[in-house]
């Protein structure tokens, strides 16, 4: 496996085939997925107070609500109808459809259950500047880079089910203000994420046909892990270390 810098693969050995590409992607997840971040360790281990959990859910809403926007941009990159049809359900997963609840509504159940006003959450007025910068950078990435890289950047979902299971179990066990109903977003993603990643992984393995394209796929995944990690860095700095920037959400009693 090539060495990694903070932003890219950095080594001389090219990835020779699709199997080597998949192995490299999985190693990136093992080394860099945000389940390893100290903030998640605190969150899942019951070490945060309610205000800190509120801050996490509030900021994460901006990411969740931007996912269907990102996916609409991905769809716009493809002339191939079959790819657009396959990707379209991701928008419905988060936005919902007529008569069906989507992931954004489930996330608002979480924030409401934690005592946050939904209007305030949806306004995104209280989120950290770094949250906005990181999420917007992700939307811009899928707009500006190749369609192959746009799809590759979604592959953090390969590693999400284990994180969701850890989150459900840990938060239900440790926080008396959390119940199964408000954790419904994560339960639903346990079913949705594997379906999404099956297609995305097949796509990049099939369409990344040169060493340069395989490296670009890996670097797209590294970029996405940085997007996720940077959001948690900002949360930790603001709500664990106590350096809340002006204008951001301040929990009661903080």
Swiss-Prot record:
Lineage: superkingdom: Bacteria
PANTHER family: 4-AMINOBENZOATE SYNTHASE, PQQC-LIKE PROTEIN
Primary role: Ring cyclization and eight-electron oxidation of 3a-(2-amino-2-carboxyethyl)-4,5-dioxo-4,5,6,7,8,9-hexahydroquinoline-7,9-dicarboxylic-acid to PQQ.
UniProt pathway: Cofactor biosynthesis; pyrroloquinoline quinone biosynthesis
Name under which the protein is recorded: Pyrroloquinoline-quinone synthase
EC number: 1.3.3.11
Pfam families for this protein: TENA_THI-4 (PF03070)
One term of GO molecular function: pyrroloquinoline-quinone synthase activity
Source organism: Rhodopseudomonas palustris (strain TIE-1)
Ranges that cross the membrane: none
Keywords: Oxidoreductase, PQQ biosynthesis
GO process annotations (BP): pyrroloquinoline quinone biosynthetic process; sulfur compound metabolic process
Catalytic activity field: 6-(2-amino-2-carboxyethyl)-7,8-dioxo-1,2,3,4,7,8-hexahydroquinoline-2,4-dicarboxylate + 3 O2 = pyrroloquinoline quinone + 2 H2O2 + 2 H2O + H(+)
InterPro entries: Haem_Oase-like_multi-hlx, PqqC, PqqC-like, Thiaminase-2/PQQC
Similarity comment: Belongs to the PqqC family.
């Amino acid at each position: 496996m090539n060495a990694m810098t903070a932003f890219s693969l950095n080594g001389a050995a090219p990835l020779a085939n699709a199997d080597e590409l998949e192995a490299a992607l999985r190693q990136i997840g093992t080394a860099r997925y945000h389940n390893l971040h100290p903030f998640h360790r605190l969150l899942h281990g019951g070490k945060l107070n309610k205000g800190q959990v509120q801050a996490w859910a509030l900021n994460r809403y901006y990411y969740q609500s931007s996912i269907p926007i990102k996916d609409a941009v991905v769809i716009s990159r493809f002339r191939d109808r079959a790819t657009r049809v396959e990707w379209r359900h991701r928008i419905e997963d988060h936005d919902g459809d007529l008569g069906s609840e989507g992931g954004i509504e489930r996330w608002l159940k979480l924030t409401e259950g934690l005592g946050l006003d939904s209007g305030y959450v949806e306004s995104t007025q209280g989120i950290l500047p770094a949250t906005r910068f990181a999420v917007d950078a992700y939307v811009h990435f899928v707009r500006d880079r190749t369609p192959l890289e746009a799809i590759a950047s979604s592959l953090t979902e390969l590693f999400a089910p284990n994180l969701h299971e850890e989150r459900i179990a840990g938060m239900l066990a440790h926080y008396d203000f959390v119940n199964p109903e408000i954790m419904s977003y994560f339960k639903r993603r346990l079913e949705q994420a594997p379906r999404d990643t099956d297609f995305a992984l097949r796509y990049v393995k099939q369409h990344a046909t040169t060493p340069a394209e395989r490296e670009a796929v890996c670097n797209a995944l590294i970029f996405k892990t940085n997007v996720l990690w940077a959001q948690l860095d900002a949360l930790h700095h603001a709500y664990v270390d106590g350096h809340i920037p002006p204008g951001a959400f301040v929990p009661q009693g903080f």
